């Protein structure tokens, strides 16, 4: 039996972000805790583990300056809830949902559990419909589909923050009068990065349709566990109560996983791979699986989690487990970045598993599926020939091989590369793909039907013009 409102001053131990409260009764897992210091400062926490007469509590604002003798703890009998309202659009919050933009507190229309309501798999609708990001390497080659979860695998020092801000500004659903919103959650970012995101949203007016949650690097790591769940709860409210198409961008999931490891170590749990907890797969799934569409509802939640791979290692537990749960990946390349190409998206290891269901006639354009396959094949051939040239020299290549080499260079410089403020439509992206393929002999375009060549190839379009 729960006994909400019971207050205790029986804190026996404080270590890391956790504290142990003894002599408790009727405490439940996940229950919200109010903590008061001797000076009257109030903090919030959550029950991580409840035993017969003892509770382990994680303190969201950190345990600094807490004293076991003078700290009082009250168990509320409720789970952690976030106040939600349409007034949250255009606002900036910290990692636990408190406004940090100088605006007033949110007057909630409702309070929702941050862990969301379980969704019956049968109630899910299959993700379809194209989301235009304005980035050619994504729209043309690794298309984002409404209701999909498509992570970006990056490395330390690569411009994933710029790409995240660009996608958040430019993303849109084509066609009818769809309401579109962006929920942006940043975990463990620096002040400089936080200012970059705020400035980027405010200068372009994108803030009007966005909700920002910013957990800074010097905020307690424990808050990072809550931040993505806060963001997703707001996204579910906008999508399923107000029929909005919501794009959720989570950065950096590596910082989230590090916070998870820190709490696991503090609880003295048996570590899994590289010290991460054995339940990290399940924990990540509770975040990623909140993307999708629901039958009978117009709204949708599309996720783009961003993570930096430690040592650029795609087999590291964080990208490895993320890849199992999500539906593809966008991979950023250090080699392309060194060439001065932005965004440095390597399209060959990148993949969107749901792309085939979101492109083609009636969604993007009839030639899109075959055009993207032909671009992949031609670019892969050009990359392979580069390796060969490094061994035997360019003199050993045939005329066609040289054209493939030129195509690969132009593909990187003209198709993948674009300005940070450049918002390309899907028509512009596909037309650019055809212009690059015109570099090759028509006999090499084996993956595209003749009718599409006659309709879209620059040689024939000029004749029609």
Curated annotation (Swiss-Prot):
For the keyword Lipid metabolism, the answer is no
* Topology with respect to the bilayer: Peripheral membrane protein
Lineage, top-rank taxon, reads: Archaea
- Write out the entry's keywords from A to Z: ATP synthesis, Cell membrane, Hydrogen ion transport, Ion transport, Membrane, Transport
| One Gene Ontology cellular component annotation held by this UniProt entry | proton-transporting two-sector ATPase complex, catalytic domain
Annotated localization: Cell membrane
Which biological process terms from the Gene Ontology are attached to this UniProt entry? proton motive force-driven plasma membrane ATP synthesis
Q: Which HAMAP family match?
A: ATP_synth_B_arch
Q: So what family is this one in?
A: Belongs to the ATPase alpha/beta chains family.
Subunit structure as annotated in this protein's UniProt entry: Has multiple subunits with at least A(3), B(3), C, D, E, F, H, I and proteolipid K(x).
> What name does UniProt use for this protein?
A-type ATP synthase subunit B
